[in-house]
C-alpha cells in the first residue's frame, strides 16, 4: 500500500533537532512519506549558540512548492515561515494542493531566543493561515500572541485564548502548556469548538527538549494523514512527543534534542484526557 504524502513548509535547523529535520524524522517514524519546501536555514554560533536565520530566495521557494504540489501532498504542515510573503503563500498552497489537512505550528521565536522573529508575522498568520488550518498548535507564548491576550498562566487563560483562536477560523486548537503551568505534570489544552479537553502526562526532564514543538505538530500531521480524527491525532501526538522528551539527550553544552524514535523504540507514554 502506498504511503500517505506529507509536506512540511519549514526552516532547516542545522543541529537537526528541530525544523524540517525533526519533521522528516517524525514522518518516518509514523509511516508517512515526508517532503520539504525549505523557507530558511538556521545556524548557530559555536561559542554562544545564538541563532542566525538566512531566508531562502523566494524564487527557489516557489520552485520547491511547484515540485511538491505536482506530487500531491495528502497533508501539509507549516513551521518557521519567516516572512509575511511566505506565510501568505503557505496558505495559498494548501488550497492549490488539494491536501486534506493543514496543520499550522505558528513558530514565532527560535528555541533559546527571546525576541519574536518578525512581529508582523503574527497578523499575517491570523489572516492567511488560521482560517484555513485544520489544527493550530501554539505554545503558551504563541497562543497569547495569536489571541491578543498576552501572557497565559493558567488553564482558564488557555481556554479563553483557545476560544479566541477558534473564532478566527481554526476548528481544532491545541495549546501546549509544557512546564510553565506545573512542575510535576505537563498540561495541554485542546478545543474543538464544543468541548475543552485537558491532556496530561507526567513532567519529564526539560533540559533536553529541543524540537518538541516541531515534533508534536509533525506527529499530528502524520496521524491525520493516516486517518485519525483531529482529536485522536492530537492525543496520539501528545503521547509521541512525551516519549521523545522523556528520552531527550545532551548534544553539547548548549542544547539537547528530543529522541524522535523513542515512541517506537523505547516506550509509549499514557496520556490522560479529561473534560474541563
Swiss-Prot record:
GO MF entries: ATP binding; hydroxymethylpyrimidine kinase activity; metal ion binding; phosphomethylpyrimidine kinase activity; pyridoxal kinase activity
Record keywords, A-Z: ATP-binding, Kinase, Magnesium, Metal-binding, Nucleotide-binding, Transferase
E.C. code: 2.7.1.35
Gene3D superfamilies xrefs: 3.40.1190.20
Keyword Magnesium on entry: yes
Enzyme class: transferase
One of the GO BP terms on file: thiamine biosynthetic process
Record-linked InterPro entries: HMP/HMP-P_kinase_dom (IPR004399), PM/HMP-P_kinase-1 (IPR013749), Ribokinase-like (IPR029056)
CDD domains named in the record: HMPP_kinase
SUPFAM superfamilies in alphabetical order: Ribokinase-like
Binding site for Mg(2+): 142
Transferase keyword on record: yes
GO cellular component: cytosol
Annotated catalysed reactions: pyridoxal + ATP = pyridoxal 5'-phosphate + ADP + H(+)
Pfam families named in the record: Phos_pyr_kin (PF08543)
Residues that hold ATP according to the record: 139, 176-180, 188, 213, 238
Family to which this protein belongs: Belongs to the ThiD family.
Function per UniProt: Phosphorylates B6 vitamers; functions in a salvage pathway. Uses pyridoxal, pyridoxine, and pyridoxamine as substrates.
Name the record gives this protein: Putative pyridoxine kinase
Natural source organism: Staphylococcus epidermidis (strain ATCC 12228 / FDA PCI 1200)
Amino acid at each position: 500500500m502506498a504511503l500517505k504524502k506529507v509536506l512540511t513548509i519549514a526552516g532547516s535547523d542545522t543541529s537537526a533537532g528541530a525544523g524540517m529535520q525533526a519533521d522528516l524524522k517524525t514522518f518516518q517514524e509514523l509511516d508517512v512519506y515526508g517532503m520539504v519546501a525549505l523557507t530558511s536555514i538556521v545556524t548557530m554560533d559555536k561559542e554562544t549558540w545564538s541563532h542566525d536565520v538566512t531566508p531562502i530566495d523566494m524564487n527557489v521557494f516557489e520552485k520547491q512548492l511547484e515540485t511538491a504540489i505536482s506530487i500531491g501532498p495528502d497533508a501539509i504542515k507549516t513551521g518557521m515561515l519567516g516572512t509575511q510573503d511566505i506565510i501568505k503563500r503557505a496558505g495559498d498552497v494548501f488550497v492549490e494542493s488539494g491536501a486534506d489537512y493543514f496543520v499550522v505550528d505558528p513558530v514565532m521565536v527560535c528555541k533559546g531566543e527571546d525576541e519574536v522573529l518578525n512581529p508582523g508575522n503574527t497578523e499575517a498568520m491570523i489572516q492567511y493561515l488560521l482560517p484555513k488550518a485544520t489544527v493550530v498548535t501554539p505554545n503558551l507564548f504563541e497562543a497569547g500572541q495569536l489571541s491578543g491576550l498576552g501572557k497565559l498562566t493558567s488553564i482558564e487563560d488557555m481556554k479563553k485564548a483557545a476560544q479566541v483562536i477558534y473564532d478566527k477560523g481554526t476548528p481544532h486548537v491545541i495549546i501546549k502548556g509544557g512546564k510553565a503551568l506545573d512542575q510535576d505534570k505537563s498540561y495541554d489544552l485542546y478545543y474543538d469548538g464544543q468541548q475543552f479537553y485537558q491532556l496530561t502526562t507526567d513532567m519529564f526532564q526539560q533540559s533536553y527538549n529541543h524540537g518538541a514543538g516541531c515534533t508534536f505538530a509533525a506527529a499530528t500531521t502524520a496521524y491525520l494523514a493516516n486517518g485519525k480524527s483531529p482529536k485522536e491525532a492530537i492525543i496520539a501526538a501528545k503521547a509521541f512527543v512525551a516519549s521523545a522528551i522523556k528520552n531527550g539527550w545532551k548534544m553539547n553544552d548548549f542544547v539537547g534534542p528530543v529522541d524522535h524514535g523513542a515512541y517506537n523504540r523505547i516506550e509509549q507514554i499514557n496520556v490522560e484526557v479529561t473534560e474541563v
